[in-house]
């Protein structure tokens, strides 16, 4: 009673109005932040209004009439019926949030709820005891001290309980999204628990004073000391202290997106953190159920042995001393997507014809087959996997190895004799094979020279195409041309064969390319031999000559053709060789030294002045000075008389 007597003095009406005005301003800031949060997280999307009346109709009606109206109504309005809005009615609050702005009447009532919830944190009993004599002071004109009832009600509390805390100030610049989420989650957690108590308070609202109006929800009376409106959410004791508000409320985003039109604000999921951590218990909605895919014992525990099973037909065929690995082909993509009830026929591919044709103890190599359907169809757009096929006739003769059984094209098997070996199976171009003789081997198909058919089949392919360094250093004129030169694939491009394969050339083009290669080789070989004999150049230097034929003609054609009939030679050599070539005379192959030089970069001529002569009559041109003229016809140096003769031929 000492506590009651010490707090008996009540504030005046103006003080209470100023306190309510501050709370109204604070609640206005919260409404602005709440509206901003609703617009940001798409919680304003609702189903049509004709469908949502039935779900919460009873509670909406109860909250609409005589709810907390005695707190802020004036004396002249006490007998007027007045419908106020509770902050726990999310449906109507969303409707008024989407409107332009709330009316002052609707703005006041959430402040009442804020004051109600703030007072809730300090209460210890389910409801304060009504006082009969104070209840009568609301109906007659009140005495000057009639506002003492809030302090009187507060003075009846047990002095051992917690003192009331002032409301938490909320600035308008606070983060809007956490506030919006907190308000929604508070309502989702406490709406069901507060329903019965609030209905009971609303039935007796006209006969109760301020002490009876401020009701404490049963679910919110057990909160810890010092909690405010933002801290009314109960935390699990097993939860860590440093876990924020986001850790308390974990909703499945996919479930919210799917059911957003059917959800109201009350249906947001409040999940216990211990239940969520265990993955069990009474979780709301079946869509939140977590399935541990790794722990699924039905599908994930299958190993490779349960997937690869021998088919019945494969087991009957495999009795002939055949290895099981040769019969089974597992598709990895099918293995990943396999279901338990799926037939294993899609996993195992057995070639019956290969198994029937195989006798004895064949190895795994004889059973290799790509796609059987494509191999029988003989399609032209087959990839490499569909081109590897086992030849049954070659398989019967068990003396051949695996290399003899690989065929590049299925058409080649049909058009080629059965007794041919690997050289007759591998054809670069099947179309060329039908045009040429069918007994051509691989050497005549790959080579650009028809003389390559004289080469034996046992000769290696590298000896036919690659330039031999030892052959370049040798100056014997009787060497075989085919073992020395390389016909570049650009020859085929210049003659209209864009595919770059030398086997598509005609016989006339083969002859012209051969003559061009001969001329290129002899010219280069003579230079190399001269340098080796006279100047003692490095013996280990290899000069590779690549000839680009622009107009393939032999040198004996003379001057009847135009200038485009010459050759462009590219010399690949070591750095030592290039330095020596620059310091040597082009004609005499001696070091240039400090003597007078004649350098013609276009003709790649760098020689002594005494060696610079007319290439027709061998007349020396060493007396030329700067500004004098020389005549070059078909990249050949002419003196003035020789050039005059050429001009006379043109006039005639």
From Swiss-Prot:
Tissue: Expressed in the upper layers of stratified epithelia, including, ependyma and choroid plexus of the brain ventricles.
Biological process terms in GO annotation: embryo development ending in birth or egg hatching; epidermis development; keratinocyte differentiation; positive regulation of canonical Wnt signaling pathway; response to mechanical stimulus
Pro residues: compositionally biased ranges: 161-170
Molecular function per GO: metal ion binding
UniProt repeat feature Sequence, residue ranges: 207-226, 227-241, 242-261, 262-281, 282-301, 302-320, 321-340, 341-360, 361-380, 381-398, 399-418, 419-438, 439-458, 459-477, 478-496
PROSITE patterns named among the record's database cross-references: LIM_DOMAIN_1, LIM_DOMAIN_2
Annotated Basic residues bias: 1-10
InterPro entries linked to this entry: Cell_Prolif/Cornif_Regul, Znf_LIM
SMART domains: LIM
Amino acid composition bias (Polar residues), ranges on this chain: 97-110, 446-455
Entry GO CC: cytoplasm; membrane; perinuclear region of cytoplasm
Record carries keyword Repeat: yes
Modification type Phosphoserine: residues: 264, 343
Region of interest: Disordered: 1-29, 43-180, 353-385, 436-455
Alphabetic keyword roster: Acetylation, Cytoplasm, LIM domain, Membrane, Metal-binding, Phosphoprotein, Repeat, Zinc
Gene3D superfamilies: Cysteine Rich Protein (2.10.110.10)
Classification via CDD domains: LIM
Acetylation found in the keyword field: yes
Protein name as it appears in the record: Sciellin
Species this chain originates from: Mus musculus (Mouse)
């Amino acid at each position: 009673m000492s506590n009651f007597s010490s707090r008996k003095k009540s504030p005046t009406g103006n003080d209470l109005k100023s306190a309510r005005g501050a709370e109204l301003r604070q609640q206005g800031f919260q409404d602005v932040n709440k509206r901003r949060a609703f617009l940001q997280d798409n919680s304003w999307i609702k189903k049509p209004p004709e469908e949502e009346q039935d779900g919460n109709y009873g509670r909406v009606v109860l909250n609409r009439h005589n709810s907390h109206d005695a707190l802020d109504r004036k004396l002249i309005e006490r007998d007027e019926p007045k419908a106020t809005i509770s902050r726990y009615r999310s449906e109507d609050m969303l409707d008024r949030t989407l409107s332009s702005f709330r009316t002052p009447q609707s703005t006041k009532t959430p402040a009442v709820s804020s004051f109600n919830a703030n007072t809730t944190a300090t209460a210890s009993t389910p409801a304060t005891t009504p006082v009969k004599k104070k209840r009568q002071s609301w109906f007659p004109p009140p005495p000057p001290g009639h506002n003492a009832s809030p302090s009187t009600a507060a003075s009846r509390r047990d002095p051992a309980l917690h003192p009331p805390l002032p409301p938490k100030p909320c600035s308008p610049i606070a983060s809007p999204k956490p506030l919006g989420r907190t308000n929604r989650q508070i309502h989702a957690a406490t709406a069901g628990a507060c329903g019965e108590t609030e209905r009971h308070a609303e039935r007796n609202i006209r006969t109760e004073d301020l002490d009876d109006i401020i009701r404490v929800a049963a679910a919110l009376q057990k909160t810890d000391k010092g909690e405010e409106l933002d801290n009314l959410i109960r935390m699990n004791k097993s939860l860590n202290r440093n876990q924020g508000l986001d850790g308390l409320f974990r909703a499945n985003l996919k479930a919210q997106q799917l059911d957003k039109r059917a959800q109201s604000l009350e249906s947001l999921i409040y999940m216990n953190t211990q239940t969520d951590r265990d993955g069990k218990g009474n979780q709301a909605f079946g869509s939140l159920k977590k399935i541990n895919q790794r722990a699924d014992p039905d599908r994930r525990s299958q190993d490779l042995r349960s997937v690869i099973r021998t088919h019945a037909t494969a087991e009957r065929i495999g009795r002939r001393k055949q290895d099981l690995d040769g019969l089974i082909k597992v598709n990895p993509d099918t293995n990943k997507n396999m279901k338990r009830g799926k037939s294993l026929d899609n996993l195992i591919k057995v070639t019956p014809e290969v198994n029937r044709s195989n006798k004895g103890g064949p190895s795994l190599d004889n059973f290799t087959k790509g796609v059987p359907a494509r191999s029988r169809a003989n399609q032209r757009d087959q990839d490499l996997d569909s081109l590897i096929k086992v030849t049954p006739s070659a398989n019967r003769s068990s003396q051949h190895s695996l290399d003899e059984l690989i065929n590049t094209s299925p058409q080649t098997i049909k058009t080629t004799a059965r007794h041919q070996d690997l050289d007759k199976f591998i054809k670069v171009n099947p179309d060329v094979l039908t045009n040429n003789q069918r007994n051509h081997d691989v050497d005549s198909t790959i080579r650009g020279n028809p003389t390559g058919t004289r080469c034996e089949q046992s000769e290696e392919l590298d000896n036919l195409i690659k330039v031999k360094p030892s052959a370049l250093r040798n100056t014997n004129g009787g060497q075989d041309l085919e073992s020395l030169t390389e016909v570049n694939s650009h020859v085929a491009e210049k003659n209209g064969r864009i595919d770059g394969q030398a086997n598509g050339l005609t016989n006339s083009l083969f002859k012209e390319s051969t003559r061009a290669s001969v001329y290129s080789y002899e010219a280069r070989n003579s230079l190399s031999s001269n340098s080796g004999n006279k100047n003692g150049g490095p013996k280990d230097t290899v000069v590779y000559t690549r000839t680009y034929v622009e107009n393939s003609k032999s040198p004996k054609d003379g001057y009847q053709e135009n200038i485009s009939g010459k050759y462009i030679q590219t010399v690949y050599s070591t750095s030592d060789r290039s330095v020596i070539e620059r310091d040597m005379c082009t004609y005499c192959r001696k070091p240039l030294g400090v003597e007078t030089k004649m350098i013609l970069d276009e003709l790649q001529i760098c020689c002594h002045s005494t060696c610079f002569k007319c290439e027709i009559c061998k007349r020396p041109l060493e007396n030329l000075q700067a500004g004098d003229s020389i005549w070059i016809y078909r990249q050949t140096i002419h003196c003035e008389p020789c050039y005059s003769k050429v001009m006379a031929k043109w006039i005639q």
